[in-house]
Amino acid sequence: MRIFWQSFVDASVNAPYMARLSEYLNNIAAPGTTVQVEGISPPDREFGRLAELRCAVQAIDNGIAAEESGFDAFVMGHFQDPGLYELRSTLDIPVVGTGEATLLAASQLGRRLGLVTLDPVFEVWHYEQAERYGLGDRVVHVTGLGCKPEDFAAAFAGDQAAHARMIEDFLACALPLVERGADVVIPAGVLPGLLIGRERGLKVGHAPVVNCAAVALKSAEMWVQLRQLNG
């Protein structure tokens, strides 16, 4: 099984993250599954709707090329899922949105969802996203870390102190969500998702933290297998 993972990060700007992401995904992939991680240049650096649209167009082009190259599934490895429905209308292979897959998975773990996103600019986007997926009434609150992709570089390059600081910042943002009633915490971005990837059993109070990177990959594997079974 070959899976194409579309990141919205530029490998030349944040090489440690891209290397760690590729290593992580291929390590947790099922036997016989390979994951190819591709970035976007220029990346989604100036957060906002126009940048999301621009990157979505590039992702759609890459998705078409991936299917033509024989990939079995395409993962929109960007939690906001821009262009997700357009890609599904274009490709025959399964197309998985990290945001959609994670929100649906989290809704099976608890009733009230709290999201920690990279930047406050995405807060409204995630509320709209939850509404689009039929989960609008399940989201308690969305809060932003106020980070950019490059802020994670040291942690992904192996700096343990930087990793610990980022985890501490994430937990500090997530705690008020739990205090407001969230019983599941979602890192609304693959960057923070990968950050907590090695924190097995991570919880904020009683609320489990869902690893969106793992959920997206395993969803893609599942849909490829279901397609093989059912056509």
Language-model-detected regions and their locations in the chain:
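Short beta-strand segments enriched in small/hydrophobic residues
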Residues: 1-19, 113-116
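Extended, histidine- and acidic-residue-enriched regions that form the cofactor-binding/catalytic faces
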Residues: 7, 164, 171-209, 213, ...
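Short, glycine-/small-residue-rich phosphate/pyrophosphate-handling segment
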Residues: 15-16, 107-145, 221-231
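N-terminal beta-loop-helix "entrance" segment that forms/cooperates
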Residues: 36-57, 151-158
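Glycine-rich, highly charged phosphate/nucleotide-binding loops
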Residues: 48-65, 164-172
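Glycine/small-residue-rich loop that forms an oxyanion/phosphate-binding "nest" at active or ligand-binding sites
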Residues: 60-105, 109
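Short, acidic/small-residue loops that bind anionic groups at enzyme active sites
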Residues: 88-109, 201-223
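Active-site rim beta-loop-alpha module in soluble metabolic enzymes
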Residues: 124, 131-189, 197
